[in-house]
């Protein structure tokens, strides 16, 4: 019986020793999103839209998928303007 009590005490001490670093790590992880957000620079995307090239019917824009592409639009897409991203000019294709 005494051996069982000693083994239980050793087990509890070992578990407590592991729990303290886990709690400290959990505190670090909780603070990490604020730190990560401060490290990420802002991304600015600028779009230049040519209204004369826009579809004339309001319903035709409903399901339109548009992308910024380099160097040009792919087959089946039409260039509607220019995107400026990270200092580079991209084609605004729909």
Swiss-Prot record:
The UniProt keywords, alphabetically, are:
Antibiotic, Antimicrobial, Antiviral defense, Defensin, Disulfide bond, Fungicide, Secreted, Signal
GO terms under biological process: antibacterial humoral response; antimicrobial humoral immune response mediated by antimicrobial peptide; cellular response to lipopolysaccharide; defense response to fungus; defense response to Gram-negative bacterium; defense response to Gram-positive bacterium; defense response to virus; disruption of plasma membrane integrity in another organism
Give the GO molecular function terms.
protein homodimerization activity
Q: Which SMART domains match?
A: Defensin_propep, DEFSN
Q: Which cysteines are cross-linked by disulfides? A: 66-94, 68-83, 73-93
Q: Which residues form the propeptide?
A: 20-38
Q: Which GO terms describe its cellular component?
A: azurophil granule lumen; extracellular exosome; extracellular region; extracellular space; Golgi lumen
Where does it localize?
Answer: Secreted
- The signal sequence is 1-19
Q: Which family does it belong to?
A: Belongs to the alpha-defensin family.
Q: Which PANTHER family match?
A: ALPHA-DEFENSIN 1, NEUTROPHIL DEFENSIN 1-RELATED
Quaternary state and interactors? Dimer.
Role, per record: Effector molecule of the innate immune system that acts via antibiotic-like properties against a broad array of infectious agents including bacteria, fungi, and viruses. Possesses the ability to neutralize bacterial toxins such as B.anthracis lethal factor, Clostridium difficile cytotoxin B as well as leukocidin produced by Staphylococcus aureus. Also blocks herpes simplex virus infection by interacting with envelope glycoprotein B and thus preventing its binding to heparan sulfate, the receptor for attachment.
- Protein name as annotated: Neutrophil defensin 3
